[in-house]
Amino acid sequence: MIDIIEIIPKCSFSWEKLKEMKDQDIKFWAADGLNQLRIVGIDEKQKSFYMINQSGKITWPLRYENLEEVHDKIHHGTLTLLSYEIDRLIPTWGNYVSGLFKYFGCDKG
C-alpha cells in the first residue's frame, strides 16, 4: 500500500507573521548579510509595510500583494530566491525581500 504524504511548506510566511515581527521588533538580515532589518510600520488599510535598516533608513511601503506573488513563485519553482531575480518583479527590493524570505525559511525546500 502506498502512503500519500502531503507536503507542507516549511516557511512561516503570512500577513499575520509580518505583523507579529513588527510587534515583537524581530530583526533579520538582508540577503547580502550587510544590513540588519526590521519591520517598523504596518498599513492595514493598504495592506503594506515599511522596513528600517540598521542605519535608520526607512523604506517606502511594500504591498503584501506583491510580496505574496513573489513568495508563491518561489515555492512553485518559477523563481529562485536570489536578489537580482526578485528585483525583476519588485524593483530595488530584491536584497531585502530575499533576506525576509530566508528568515521565513523559504530557502529550505
Can you say where each PLM-predicted feature lies in the sequence?
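Intrinsically disordered, charged low-complexity linkers and terminal tails
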Residues: 1-109
